[in-house]
A protein has these predicted regions:
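Short coil/turn segments at alpha/beta junctions that flank glycine-rich nucleotide-binding fingerprints
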Residues: 98, 115-118
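Acyl-donor (CoA/ACP) binding surface of acyl/acetyltransferases
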Residues: 94, 102, 147, 156, ...
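Acetyl-CoA-dependent GNAT
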Residues: 2-94, 105-107, 111, 115, ...
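Conserved hydrophobic beta-strand within the GNAT/NAT acetyltransferase core sheet
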Residues: 86, 120-124
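Conserved glycine-rich acetyl-CoA-binding loop
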Residues: 92-106, 125-133, 137-138
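Positions that flank functional sites
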Residues: 46, 127, 150
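Conserved catalytic-core motifs of GNAT/GCN5-like acyltransferases
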Residues: 123-124, 136, 141-157
Length: 165
């Protein structure tokens, strides 16, 4: 994509099924650190995320082959009809509130609209009020409560039109 400053950039990522075990482990650690959720390697490798503008990795440094450079990811997949689903969107806490999330979201929205989609759906933890606010600013609203969706508590399903911010 483009360099965002401080040696950090969003790049198109490989399909999760093509991640090496070391990269998959780094993704699992990112989810555990930032979201408090523990997943298995199989749960990552079976995610149906194609290689497209909704599959982005936030990488820091010059050696983007090093899994330790992973600072965030956005994984989205075509869902149904005109809806695209964000399966995962996570950025390390030290890289939040610096515009990286906005940059990824806007790139994703452009790609999804070009792909014929007009709506987005995702799940977010009820305790993740910052994430909910990020999505509300982009026009998403809570549609349903998701009891038991997250191992660590209540979740919400949010949906809205694809909008940049």
């Amino acid at each position: 994509m483009r360099l965002l400053g401080d040696g950090i950039q969003w790049m198109l990522g490989p399909e999760p099924k093509n991640l090496s075990p070391v990269w998959t482990q780094e993704v699992l650690q990112l989810f555990l650190r930032e979201n408090g959720e523990k997943y298995s390697q199989d749960s990552i490798s079976t995610l149906p995320i194609p290689k497209w503008g909704g599959n982005l990795l936030l990488l820091e440094g010059t050696d983007t082959t090093d899994p330790n450079c992973l600072k965030g990811l956005l994984w989205a997949t075509p869902f149904m009809n005109d809806i695209v689903r964000v399966a995962a969107f996570s950025i390390t806490s030290e890289h939040q509130s610096k515009g990286y999330g906005r940059a990824a979201w806007n790139h994703f929205v452009d790609s999804a609209i070009k792909g014929g989609f007009s709506k987005v759906q995702l799940e977010v933890k009820a305790s993740n009020t910052r994430g909910q606010e990020f999505y509300r600013k982009r026009g998403l609203v809570i549609m349903n409560e998701l009891q038991g969706y997250y191992s660590s508590g209540l979740g919400y399903m949010m949906r809205g039109n694809l909008n940049k911010y």
